[in-house]
A protein has these predicted regions:
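An alpha-helical, amphipathic repeat domain used for nucleic-acid recognition
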Residues: 1-174
Length: 174
């Protein structure tokens, strides 16, 4: 749902204040770019000067219409972070917390993502994208091994997955 540039400029901070319709329009415009968490929408409306009761009403209406669903948002973001960025569960959890997703929702999403994806394979893909085959064959050396471990830790993988992947280093490119 795209809004013409002229209409975008019409919604100013003073217009949004006390005007629930303008707040709804601002929220729709904010959601037109990409999916957002309810906390992101709440912050955006708050920055625009909306009153807290108006913000709650707009968010409730967006959820009712199906435009705002934290579970679907978290699942879609988690899936894309796994498939595109090769992130592990810890990194996904941290990113979703920063986006304002509820802890129960994050736990449920991570449980479902773990059933859908093998994080061991994701960790192998993360190493393949970071290191060349020749570098990976040198995993016996402490320096290269520490680099690989550090890379996977930064990507959010657990020690058990990292140990499993590093110990089977010869199979990573196979």
């Amino acid at each position: 749902m795209a809004y013409p540039a002229k209409r975008k400029k019409e919604i100013r901070k003073r217009e949004v204040k006390g005007n629930i319709e303008a707040a709804k329009e601002l929220a729709f415009r904010f959601l037109s770019y990409r999916s957002r968490s309810s906390e992101e929408v709440r912050q955006k409306l708050s920055q625009a000067g909306c009153a807290p009761p108006d913000i709650d009403g707009v968010i409730a209406r967006l959820e009712e219409l199906g435009y705002l669903n934290d579970y679907d948002y978290a699942f879609a973001m988690g899936r894309s972070w796994i498939e595109i960025k090769c992130w592990g569960p810890s990194r996904i959890r941290d990113a979703l917390v920063k986006k304002g997703v509820a802890p129960e929702t994050i736990t449920a999403v991570l449980r479902e993502l773990a059933m859908e994806h093998d994080f061991r394979r994701v960790a192998c893909r993360a190493l393949k994208s970071r290191f060349t085959r020749a570098e990976m064959l040198k995993l016996n050396g402490d320096k290269m091994r520490q680099r690989a471990i550090g890379h996977l830790l930064r990507r959010g993988f657990s020690w058990s997955i990292i140990a499993d992947v590093i110990d089977s280093g010869d199979n990573i490119f196979g």
